[in-house]
Amino acid sequence: MKQYLVIGGSSGIGAALVQQLKASGYHTTATYNESKTIESKGINYVHFDVLDPNSTLEIPEVLDGVVYCPGRINLKPFHRLTKSDFALDYEVQVLGAIDVIQQALPSLKKSESPSIVLFSTVAVQTGFTFHSTVSASKGAIEGLTRSLAAEFSPKVRVNAIAPS
């Protein structure tokens, strides 16, 4: 049975994806970052905080896919943003993805057809009002995606999607 790991799988797009993977019969581990425990039959939910260096993942021996989609958006006018706002988005979106990929890569390489999926935003390409922090961090995700796709090819597929 294929094994998938969804970071940020407790709400939004991540939760919908987890349900789709479950319906397709795949074994799925999904992370959440709320203080309450989440339970769902057929899905292994684990607490994981991408900002906590002591938070670790239990990754299966063989992993077929990783989806990195923690939810965070800070919509403010540029003049009200601080360097800390930009740093937090970068830490969650980019450094968190790097950490998860580095932890998962040995298990991904043992799969026949592994895949990593990251999330960007159309705001990177088109520019949206009040999207400075998310556009900056997701722009970095797009660069990371291209770099890792070239580096890991042809064994591991790496893609980013940009929902509107």
Kindly give the residue locations of the regions a language model identified.
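Active-site loop-to-helix junction immediately N-terminal to the catalytic Tyr of the SDR YXXXK motif
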Residues: 81, 127-135, 147
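N-terminal Rossmann NAD(P)H-binding glycine-rich loop of SDR-like oxidoreductase domains
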Residues: 10, 18
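Residue(s) in the substrate-gating loop at a strand-loop-helix junction
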Residues: 121
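A short, exposed helix-loop element centered on a Lys and neighboring polar residues
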Residues: 101-102, 146
